[in-house]
Regions:
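Extreme N-terminus of proteins, especially the signal/transit-peptide cleavage junction
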Residues: 2-8
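Acetyl-CoA-dependent GNAT
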Residues: 12-95, 107-109, 113, 146-150, ...
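Conserved glycine-rich acetyl-CoA-binding loop
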Residues: 90-108, 115-117, 128-135, 139
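Generic N-terminal simple sequence motifs
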Residues: 1-2, 174
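Conserved phosphate-binding and hydrolysis motifs of nucleotide-dependent enzymes
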Residues: 62, 66, 101-103, 141
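C-terminal "cap" of GNAT-fold acetyltransferases
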Residues: 7, 24-27, 55-56, 84, ...
Length: 187
């Protein structure tokens, strides 16, 4: 008898998820940020972030294992978004859930949200030392935008969503409207 693979669900965050998302986000960023950095307070304040942005969680077998924060241009949480772009912030996956496609599923979900909203591109900042995350972004077709780099250790990556774009997954599919369904899949 073989066990079924865990079932992954991506859904909007609920208040009951705030503590888990805070913990996962802080733990995900801990290896890359100095312990005394004020950024930890921002990472941990999921409730406040949820009031000014859109957060989705990845859940496996009823447990939150990751999250993605999406912000529009002009949001207090937008760092690099320009008009007509959707910015991804604070992408986090529980270290024990890594390597199972959770991060990729969250990023792909966010890309579908951006397409459904008619945005021209997705944009995000990432640290060069976040090797696992960079592999996901590179594999999906994100490209570095050196002219938008705002810190020597942080890259700005973009993913074009318009027709003829260079990203591997740039073809729009009208069935991919994330507002209509909560994504779930086995991994």
């Amino acid at each position: 008898v073989t066990a079924s693979p865990p079932h992954l669900v991506i859904r909007p965050i609920e208040a009951r998820d705030f503590a888990a998302v805070s913990l996962i986000t802080v733990e995900s960023y801990r290896p890359f940020i100095r312990p005394d950095d004020d950024y930890f307070a921002l990472l941990a304040d999921t409730e406040r972030r949820a009031s000014a942005s859109e957060i989705v969680v990845a859940e496996v077998s009823g447990q939150v294992v990751g999250s993605l924060t999406m912000v529009e241009w002009g949001s207090p949480y937008a760092d690099v978004a320009q008009q007509d772009e959707l910015e991804f912030r604070m992408i986090a996956v529980n270290p024990r859930a890594r390597g199972h496609g959770v991060g990729t599923a969250l990023v792909e979900y966010g890309i579908r949200v951006a397409r459904a909203r008619g945005r021209s591109r997705v944009v995000l900042s990432t640290m060069d030392v976040m090797v696992e995350a960079r592999r996901i972004y590179d594999r999906l077709g994100f490209a570095e935008a050196p002219d938008r780099r705002w810190h020597p250790a942080i890259s700005v990556l973009t993913f074009p969503l318009h027709r003829g774009a260079t990203g591997q997954r740039s073809q729009q599919n009208s069935a991919d409207d994330p507002r209509k369904v909560t994504e779930s899949r086995d991994f």
